[in-house]
A protein has these predicted regions:
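N-terminal intrinsically disordered, cationic/polar leader segments
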Residues: 2-138
Length: 138
């Protein structure tokens, strides 16, 4: 079960994890993606924001930028054993710089996400802000 105040919702999908992410701005889509990933991998339990890491990601367009951003989050989790909890994102065109806050993975029992996918990925501006759909391979 997830609180109503979250800016993302998990949608039904046959084999993977499908997430609808909302934000007032495109920056918020990326920031809320971090929260959605954190929520899933730690079963909705909070993750401390004890450390910060700076990441930079590029894409050829907005969907590829989001894909590469998620891929970088998964790299932090798998290779650096760093669990993201929130982010502060700066966008300039198809370039992203973010400070990712989180904690050491050893402090948590995590559910694995294998990879980001381009399947069903969509990012669009709506009347009420921005919305993205992402599917993660688990």
């Amino acid at each position: 079960m997830q609180p109503k105040s979250l800016s993302f919702v998990f949608l039904d999908h046959t084999a993977d994890i499908k997430i609808q992410i909302k934000g007032a701005t495109l920056n918020e889509i990326f920031e809320n993606t971090v929260q959605a990933v954190a929520h899933y991998i730690n079963s909705g339990d909070p993750i401390a924001s004890k450390k910060g890491k700076i990441i930079e990601v590029q894409g050829i367009d907005t969907p590829s930028l989001l894909y590469n951003f998620i891929d970088e989050l998964l790299y932090l989790i798998d290779a650096e054993h760093f669990i993201p909890s929130k982010a502060s994102v700066f966008l300039r065109g198809n370039n992203l710089k973010a400070e990712i806050f989180g904690d050491d993975a050893k402090n948590y029992h995590l559910t694995q996400i294998k990879a980001a996918t381009f399947a069903e990925m969509d990012i669009s501006k709506k009347k009420s802000g921005w919305e993205a759909i992402v599917v993660l391979d688990v």
